[in-house]
Amino acid sequence: MEPPFFLLLLLLVVSSSSPSAALLSAKGVNNEVQALIVIKNLLKDPHGVLKSWDQNSVDPCSWAMITCSPDFLVTGLEAPSQHLSGLLSPSIGNLTNLETVLLQNNNITGPIPAEIGRLENLKTLDLSSNSFYGEIPSSVGHLESLQYLRLNNNTLSGPFPSASANLSHLVFLDLSYNNLSGPIPESLARTYNIVGNPLICDANREQDCYGTAPMPMSYSLNGSRGGALPPAARDRGHKFAVAFGSTAGCMGLLLLAAGFLFWWRHRRNRQILFDVDEQQIENVNLGNVKRFSFRELQAATEGFSGKNILGKGGFGNVYRGQLPDGTLVAVKRLKDGNAAGGEAQFQTEVEMISLALHRNLLRLYGFCMTATERLLVYPFMSNGSVASRLKAKPALEWGTRRRIAVGAARGLVYLHEQCDPKIIHRDVKAANVLLDEACEAVVGDFGLAKLLDHRESHVTTAVRGTVGHIAPEYLSTGQSSDRTDVFGFGILLLELVTGQTALEFGKSSNHKGAMLDWVKKMQSEKKVEVLVDKGLGGGYDRVEVEEMVQVALLCTQYLPAHRPRMSDVVRMLEGDGLADRWEKASGHSTAAADSLSHSHRTSDPAPPAADFAAAFGRCFSDLTDDSSLLVQAVELSGPR
């Protein structure tokens, strides 16, 4: 009896040391699973996006819309734009490890549960564009880690909780278009939006809150309010003017001299710096970003020293910088900042990227505009890019590679399906996917992508991208769409599997110029181990590798219409619907092969996908890895 008892005791000690063990109830039920099932039961899910949430499961980390930490704790509930309705359950307060809650653009109704204040690790809360009503719970003031709070476009009423003044880390707040009243705490957030609330006001002007509705207040980037001075300040100004009235003439002369000096210095400095407050750029929607002076960024990067260069891209160099408070940043210095079209590109990026807030997208931190310079400031990603990490030692473990694939896919889903207008990246590659401190994927460099309003595609006379990642239709016609990004993402998946860039992989002696055909051949012959990064050794799951290769081949099909949407890609990477999609794609391939065989007998056909890949590989065989490409489209169709 003694050995079994000892083993049981040892097992108990080991299991209790696991972080996730604390989540188990006395009956061995995962408390996070219980909470999520209660949330699911109160929501109406017409499209079945939560069908993978199984109450009999002990591991919610494999569920759709759920993100977990390396310790298998639920840290993200992300179900934006999923047509969900019903109520948000108070059980959300039991998910105490949550860091991100994204439920925007649904039709969830009812009050915001007060239990949400128990999420002490929560950093991002987005409940915007739903039908929540009632008061904002005072427990929101307990979310001391909160950085982003969006409650806009609901029907919330009552005052904003005074306890929210405790939110010392809050960077961005959007309460616009509700029915809120009363003052906003003075030091709540660096940037916030309260327009569309008829009786909301500044904390310093509380006496005006319940009178006639004032005009919406405007805010500068540093949070200062516009408008007239309060009455007490006007009285002091009047007394000051009377007391010194006898010296008005002298003061006038001094002011005139000072004005002349200011004009002279301003005219001289215009050759170096551009005043962004001038009328000609007032139409820039600055969003949630900070304005830097050129000298600030020059000092932060040590004069844009070559030793601080993090990378070079088609739009300019990226420099490592350190702000006076010690914050590390990445500064992108755009090429030809004063050239024709440069300002329009800059405005596009500042306006659009500042509104694109997602855990898997690189957030724009600030900007700088001068007469000759355009610069963008981002948070510094300590783990670099996926491309650099794949070349480093030790090899990136397989589980991390899978997590990177899913994270990058979710970021692209947000750009394609949740931004209005949608954003097409046009250069999806490992070098443009960064890794944060937890090795989570963060997609960057999408700010200068072509934006589509509500059209399906865009035709341009210039093709920008990286050799090996450019979709065939984009290279040949200049026509880009969200399926162009899907193609690039498929190549990214192969980079994660092989540990090589597209050009490295395509130039090897065994399969030069026909990479995708060779990958498909290895997959069909069940030889995927030939593809796997040798640095992994045996540390990978063969079935998972086969599935990722299948998804990559689906994404890189020659015809854009046959490629899946990025939301479908996410589901397939999570194990939902891949088998059916692969079978259907195999049918397409068989039909295409039969058609090609017939056309060879009857005429000289246009080059198929394989020939295109081979020709592409030969044309650019002299290029180096990650070479950027900016060429004129071979043939343009449709309007330019």
From Swiss-Prot:
Annotated binding of ATP, by residue = 310-318, 332
Q: What is the enzyme's class at the highest EC level?
A: transferase
Q: Per its UniProt entry, which superkingdom is the organism in?
A: Eukaryota
Tell me the GO molecular function terms.
ATP binding; protein serine kinase activity; protein serine/threonine kinase activity
Q: Cross-referenced InterPro entries, in alphabetical order?
A: Kinase-like_dom_sf, LRR_dom_sf, LRR_N_plant-typ, LRR_R13L4/SHOC2-like, Prot_kinase_dom, Protein_kinase_ATP_BS, Ser-Thr/Tyr_kinase_cat_dom, Ser/Thr_kinase_AS
Where does the sequence pass through the membrane?
Answer: 242-262
Q: Indicate where this protein resides in the cell.
A: Cell membrane
All copies of domain Protein kinase, residue ranges: 304-583
Membrane topology annotation: Single-pass membrane protein
SUPFAM superfamilies the UniProt entry points to: L domain-like, Protein kinase-like (PK-like)
Keywords for this entry? ATP-binding, Cell membrane, Glycoprotein, Kinase, Leucine-rich repeat, Membrane, Nucleotide-binding, Plant defense, Receptor, Repeat, Serine/threonine-protein kinase, Signal, Transferase, Transmembrane, Transmembrane helix
Q: Which segments does the topology annotation call Extracellular?
A: 23-241
List cellular component terms (GO): plasma membrane
Q: Which reaction does it catalyse?
A: L-seryl-[protein] + ATP = O-phospho-L-seryl-[protein] + ADP + H(+); L-threonyl-[protein] + ATP = O-phospho-L-threonyl-[protein] + ADP + H(+)
Tell me which Gene3D superfamilies the record gives: Phosphorylase Kinase, domain 1, Ribonuclease Inhibitor, Transferase(Phosphotransferase) domain 1
The UniProt similarity line reads:
Belongs to the protein kinase superfamily. Ser/Thr protein kinase family.
Its assembly, as annotated, is:
Interacts with MSBP1.
What job does the chain carry out?
LRR receptor kinase that may be involved in defense response.
Name of this protein: LRR receptor kinase SERL2
Instruction: State the species of origin.
Output: Oryza sativa subsp. japonica (Rice)
Q: What is the lineage of its organism?
A: Eukaryota, Viridiplantae, Streptophyta, Embryophyta, Tracheophyta
